[in-house]
């Protein structure tokens, strides 16, 4: 699933191409990919409108259109939004095509979990998907103290807490594993057992892995590509994620893979306590 760095990379790459471009036609090839309005109403509402801005909130993209309309896009497991300068034949799993005044956006999703939701702009932050999100980890209002305050009542594993989007928005399996490794914290530790010193290590570790992920244009294993169809490079920098059974790059001990909060989790039992 695209996490904060991947979604931010998609936002930046789309912004290069579509701002002030007009939606001339929308082709909905699978109606289940769109939400908010019936298929024809959805298409009629946005036809002729320009993209004014693209923002990110957690793992969601928020597209502001003219006349008070917005798209909320969530890629979920395998969703992709790719810009094509010239008209392209849709792939098998391309569910929505936005034909613009210059170029096209193809919304493609092999597993059919991703969605494009049409909402009134003034109502979008009240949508349940966005209203429940925690703070953005890379914004000024978030700090080690705020992270500690939010972890204090959490009686669950710290890895599970980091995956909870109401705690902090945008962190998923990849960056949770990497942040915990950098902070030297075992993923099974109870969230409310972390000391002030440990939280002061975890907070910058979260920020660093997310910032480095963005700088590397995200992590690509299978499906993820940016809006230009290019893969990310952060998979080359991963210390633990996806490396269960391999030696730790810091101490040489064998990395352990467990199942935690329903997700595969990899950590070093020597470096993380």
UniProtKB/Swiss-Prot annotation:
UniProt record, GO biological process: base-excision repair
Keyword Protein biosynthesis: no
Coiled-coil stretches: none
Disulfide bonds: none
Cofactor binding note from Swiss-Prot or TrEMBL: Binds 1 zinc ion per subunit.
Family annotation (Pfam families): Fapy_DNA_glyco (PF01149), H2TH (PF06831), zf-FPG_IleRS (PF06827)
Name of protein: Formamidopyrimidine-DNA glycosylase
Naturally occurring in which organism (per UniProt): Desulfitobacterium hafniense (strain Y51)
Gene designation: mutM
